[in-house]
C-alpha cells in the first residue's frame, strides 16, 4: 500500500474571502477536562462548554452562518492534553457554496496527548453544485491516546433532486500515532461522473467515514454486529462496511503496524440522506463508548434539535 508521508494539499494563496482560525486546548484542572486556552480569528467560535457526563468536556463549534464560498479559509487546531477527554460537534451542516473561481479551504489538525481521548463528531459538509474545495484532516495521537471521529460529505442536495453536476472536492485524511502513519487517504470528486462510478460513490450522494483507534478483536466484533443491525434497519437507504488496519486486523495484507495501540478500524458509509448515516454512526459510537467505559454516553442535545 502506497502511503504518502506528507500532506500534498497546501493552503491556497487567495486575496478573496475571509480567513477564520480557531485553536482550542483542553487539559485536566480540578479533576475535570476544561477548555484551558482559546484563540480565534474571524467568525469561528464556540459556545460555552458542557458537562453532561461529569468530567468529559463537550464543546459545540460554531461555523459562519452564511456558509463557505470560494477564497474562504477555515482552520481548526484542537489539542487534548494528557488524560483529558473532549467531545466536539457542530449544531448544523457546513455549507460550501458555488465557487467564484477561487478555492475554499478547510483544515483540521487534531492532537491528542498520552492517555487522552478526543471525540470529533461534526455534522455533515454539504457541497453545492459548482463548489471548489480542498479539505485536510490531520490526527496526531500520542501513546495510549484514543480517538473516535467521523466525516460525512454530501454532494449536491439529493432531497431537492439537485446533483453535484459540476465543481470539485479534494480531501485528505491522515492519522498518525507517535509520528507513525496509521492511515492516509484521499477523496477526489469532480462532478456527477465521479459520483456515478462504481469505484467511487456508486451513485450515492453521500459518503461517510468513521475512524476508531485503538481497537481489539472483541471491539471489532461488536462494531460489525452494530453495522449488520443498522444495515438491516435502513436497507437500501445506506451501504455500510468496515476495514481494519493494524495488529487487530484479520487480514495480514492490511497490517501496517505491529502494536495493539496502532490498530484502527474505519467504517464506511454511502447513502442519499444524512439521517440514516448519522443514526448508524451514532449507534457505533455508543457501542465503542460502552466498550471503553462500561456505560453509554450522553448524546449531545444539539443533535436532537
Swiss-Prot record:
Q: What are the subcellular locations of this protein?
A: Cytoplasm
Q: Does the keyword Chaperone apply?
A: yes
The protein's matches in Pfam families, at most eight in alphabetical order, are given as: UreD (PF01774)
Q: Name one GO molecular function term.
A: nickel cation binding
Keyword list, A-Z: Chaperone, Cytoplasm, Nickel insertion
Do you know which InterPro entries this protein is assigned to? UreD
Superkingdom of the source species: Bacteria
Role of this protein: Required for maturation of urease via the functional incorporation of the urease nickel metallocenter.
Q: Which family does it belong to?
A: Belongs to the UreD family.
Q: How does it assemble?
A: UreD, UreF and UreG form a complex that acts as a GTP-hydrolysis-dependent molecular chaperone, activating the urease apoprotein by helping to assemble the nickel containing metallocenter of UreC. The UreE protein probably delivers the nickel.
Q: What is this protein called?
A: Urease accessory protein UreD
Organism in which the protein naturally occurs: Shewanella halifaxensis (strain HAW-EB4)
